[in-house]
From Swiss-Prot:
This is Glycoprotein. Belongs to the lyssavirus glycoprotein family. Residues 481-533 are intravirion. Residues 523-533 have a biased composition (Polar residues). It is found in: Virion membrane. It is a single-pass type I membrane protein. InterPro entries: PH_Rhabdo_glycop, Rhabdo_glycop_CD, Rhabdo_glycop_FD. It comes from Duvenhage virus (DUVV).
Length: 533
């Protein structure tokens, strides 16, 4: 937590609520003085605000800002754009195919975008396949349209979350700001009607991981919670606290600028817009532990000084300074008047600047006036120097001053105005460069016969084609008829054999080979006897 209520309490002024941190305490109510014995001296308990009377301590758990919490809460997300890619093919009469690609957009659904994103981060091959344009189909003399509805995912797309109202701020969302992401509204509209922004996690509440649960002791009075001792042992008062939500968690902003979520706290007063929460980072956490150690050490120093006083039976102005209450509230003040130890009831207030208590030289402002001194002695070790200047033993602590400067530079801004109107795209072409393609199922539509000609030319071409086809049919029919006629008038090979003629001995025609053979044999037979004769 930032600077604890160890240094604050119920009666801090409004300036303290707005980020002013004290480094010294001085009585705003003092007196009357009464003599006391040296044995009545006591060291104040700076870890408890005594005037609240919250003495009953009970262990309990509470939520506070996690150490290391930074002002800018980054929420990783992605953009989802609906795109319809259309491939139109036309095949003309001679088979020439013309393909035209067109793109238009549509507003995607939340569930489809979530599924597409899961595909992408899981490395599903279907997502890689969907990156291509639709494969165009074609039919002769027809126009074919092939379309794909694509969900284009861009990731990461980081937005800043405002811890106060869980609104998201990004340059791409509408007006640079988006209301809280919830189950009823799981997306943010963007500057483009067809694009939505969604968180990477389906449960965006985990993005606001800035809280941690700590153990402490709640301080009650008559059963009423009025403060608590935090995990580091420092008391924090609930006086002056106001209700404030961080990341949707209801809690209390304490007067020191810290934030806690306590159970069973009824406070109807809400914080004003200028009451912000201090950051709890590693540096402030380290200093906080040093502050707690310093307070413990100062109490030990006070006890050592008190032991020395009681042992030596003597007291000095410097030792009286150890008895000053470091926490605003009721306590004791001590001084020495005419060598007599004096005590007075006092109510301490916080001091931010030295000029608050030393407005001019020689004036120590306490109780609303320049407090009178007694022989140059004021109280709590404060004296008047030889030159008339006020001398305070405790100069401002360098450690506390370092803590103050750290806290003043570590206030969470209420808004993160990252919206830049100049980044709004004027047309669709400018938006194409920030999308990746995811393509689901394909739809095809096949038109009727389309020659790509005007109406009269199309019918004229059909008529000419019909006449040409008829003429071609007639020519083919005539050719076929002539071919058949020629084939029918040509003799066969058997008939040609039978018509072969031979010449006989008497030079007469021989009708056949058999007749020729018979004729030749007869001649041979007739000539044989004569030869013998």
């Amino acid at each position: 937590m930032p600077l604890n209520a160890v240094i604050f309490t119920l009666l801090l002024r409004c300036s303290i609520c707005l980020g002013k941190f004290p480094f010294y305490t001085i009585p705003d109510k003092l007196g009357p003085w009464s003599p006391i014995d040296i044995h009545h001296l006591s060291c104040p308990n700076n870890l408890v605000v005594e005037d609240e009377g919250c003495t009953t301590l009970t262990p309990f758990s509470y939520m506070e800002l996690k150490v290391g919490y930074i002002t800018s809460i980054k929420v990783s997300g992605f953009t989802c754009t609906g795109v319809v890619t259309e491939a139109e093919t036309y095949t003309n009469f001679v088979g020439y195919v013309t393909t035209t690609f067109r793109r238009r957009h549509f507003r995607p659904s939340v569930n489809s975008c979530r599924d597409a994103y899961n595909w992408k981060i899981a490395g599903d091959p279907r997502y890689e396949e969907s990156l291509h344009n639709p494969y165009p189909d074609s039919h002769w003399l027809r126009t074919v349209k092939t379309t794909k509805e694509s969900l284009l995912i861009i990731s990461p797309s980081v937005a800043d979350m405002d811890a106060y109202d869980k609104k998201l701020y990004s340059k791409i969302v509408s007006n640079g700001r988006c209301s809280e992401i919830s189950p009823g509204s799981p997306f943010c509209p963007t500057n483009h009607e067809y694009t939505i922004w969604m968180p990477e996690s389906s449960n965006p509440g985990i993005s606001c991981d800035i809280f941690t649960r700590s153990m402490g002791k709640k301080a009650t009075k008559d059963g009423q919670l009025c403060g608590f001792v935090d995990e580091r042992g420092l008391y924090k008062s609930l006086k002056g606290a106001c209700r404030l939500r961080l990341c949707g968690i209801s809690g209390l902003r304490l007067m020191d600028g810290s934030w806690v979520s306590l159970p069973q706290v009824n406070n109807s007063e809400w914080c004003s817009p200028d009451q912000l929460v201090n950051i709890h980072d590693f540096h402030s956490d380290e200093i906080e532990h040093l502050v707690a150690d310093e307070l413990v050490k100062k109490r030990e120093d006070c006890l050592d000084a008190l032991e020395t006083i009681l042992f030596t039976k003597s007291i000095s102005f410097r030792r009286l300074s150890h008895l000053r209450k470091l926490v605003p509230g009721f306590g004791k003040a001590y001084t020495i008047i005419n060598r007599t130890l004096m005590e007075a009831e006092a109510h301490y207030k916080s001091v931010r600047e030295w000029k608050e208590i030393i407005p001019s030289k020689g004036c120590l402002k306490a109780g609303g006036r320049c407090y009178p001194h007694h022989n140059g002695i004021f109280f709590n070790g404060i004296i008047l120097g030889p030159g008339g200047e006020i001398l305070i033993p405790e100069m401002q602590s360098a450690l506390l001053q370092q803590h103050i400067e750290l806290l003043e530079s570590s206030v969470v801004p209420l808004k993160h105005p990252l919206a830049d109107p100049s980044t709004v795209f004027k047309n669709d072409d400018e938006a194409e460069s920030f999308v990746d393609v995811h393509l689901p199922d394909t739809n095809q539509k096949i038109s009727g016969i389309d020659l790509g000609l005007p109406e009269w030319k199309r019918y004229f071409l059909i008529g000419v084609s019909a006449v040409a086809l008829l003429a071609l049919s007639i020519i083919i029919a005539v050719c076929c008829k002539r071919f058949r006629k020629r084939k029918k008038s040509k003799p066969g090979p058997v008939e040609l054999t039978r018509k072969v003629s031979v010449i006989s001995k008497g030079n007469g025609p021989v009708p056949s080979w058999e007749s020729y053979k018979e004729g030749t044999t007869g001649d041979v037979r007739n000539t044989t006897p004569s030869t013998r004769e």
